[in-house]
């Protein structure tokens, strides 16, 4: 009886990853993005979200901004006595991005909870949704969009050659896993789907081709694409699109 109780004390589950090292937050994602940027023939520099939100960095100095959001979303720390932290895109960052794009700046952003946090986060407001629609030109179409991480590019004016790629959805040593990629729905006539999840055919990424600026929004973190060549091909296509404005 005691042996049986011991085996169930912490819950019953499989032991697939019991002896394996699992990647967490390695904090090197600007380098991963940067490698794909450099391989595409562009130079880059990096800064923190906080530096941008607090005005230490002028986004207007750069023709293209790549916003790395990863799996960040609003949450509490410990028992939650200090309130909520880690919004995917804070109010101040929203202001900076809205001003940047209104003045002609071109934006790439990727993450798995960006729209979910703006729509359903514990601090979300109607203004958050309007920011997504008016600045990101996208809206929340749902989470849990893919278990396989397989994505393909339909033939569009964004990418005429068919591209397939896979992002990580299982625990691994190389990069963190994406449990809930989101469906990114285009908003407006000038916004359209450029990537789809292979098994559901739902929208995985959206491009906006406006009169004054362009944006690309991925519903999964760019850095979790498992193949270096696939990352570079996608980044090259994105930068080519964003550079045309």
Predicted feature residues:
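Solvent-exposed loop/turn segments at secondary-structure junctions
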Residues: 51-54, 69-75, 107, 113-117, ...
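The substrate-binding groove and active-site-proximal loops of carbohydrate-active enzymes
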Residues: 17-25, 67-88, 221
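Aromatic-Pro/Gly-enriched surface loop or interdomain linker
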Residues: 1-61, 222, 236-245
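Alpha-helical scaffolding within the catalytic cores
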Residues: 50-56, 91-96, 200-205
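A glycine-rich, often tryptophan-bearing local segment used as a flexible ligand/cofactor-contacting loop or short
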Residues: 73-180, 191, 196
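A glycine-centered loop/beta-turn motif at secondary-structure junctions
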Residues: 106, 134-135, 143, 162, ...
């Amino acid at each position: 009886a005691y042996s049986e109780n011991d085996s169930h004390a912490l819950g019953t589950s499989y032991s697939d990853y019991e002896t394996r090292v699992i990647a967490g937050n390695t904090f090197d994602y600007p380098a991963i993005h940067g490698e794909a940027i450099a391989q595409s023939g562009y130079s880059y520099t990096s800064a923190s979200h906080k530096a941008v939100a607090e005005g230490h960095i002028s986004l207007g100095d750069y023709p293209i901004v790549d916003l790395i959001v990863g799996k960040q979303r609003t949450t509490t720390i410990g028992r939650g006595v200090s309130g909520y932290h880690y919004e995917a895109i804070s109010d101040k960052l929203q202001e900076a991005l809205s001003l940047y794009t209104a003045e002609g700046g071109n934006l790439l952003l990727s993450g798995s909870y960006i729209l979910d946090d703006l729509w359903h986060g514990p601090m979300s407001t109607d203004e958050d949704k309007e920011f997504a629609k008016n600045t990101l030109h996208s809206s929340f179409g749902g989470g849990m969009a893919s278990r396989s991480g397989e994505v393909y590019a339909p033939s569009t004016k964004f990418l005429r050659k068919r591209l397939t790629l896979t992002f990580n959805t299982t625990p691994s040593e190389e990069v963190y896993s994406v449990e809930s990629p989101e469906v990114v729905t285009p908003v407006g006539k000038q916004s359209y789907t450029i990537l789809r999840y292979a098994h559901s055919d739902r929208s995985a990424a959206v491009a906006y081709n406006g009169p004054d600026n362009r944006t690309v929004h991925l519903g999964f973190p760019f850095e979790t694409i498992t193949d270096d060549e696939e990352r570079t091909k996608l980044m090259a296509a994105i930068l080519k699109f964003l550079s045309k404005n």
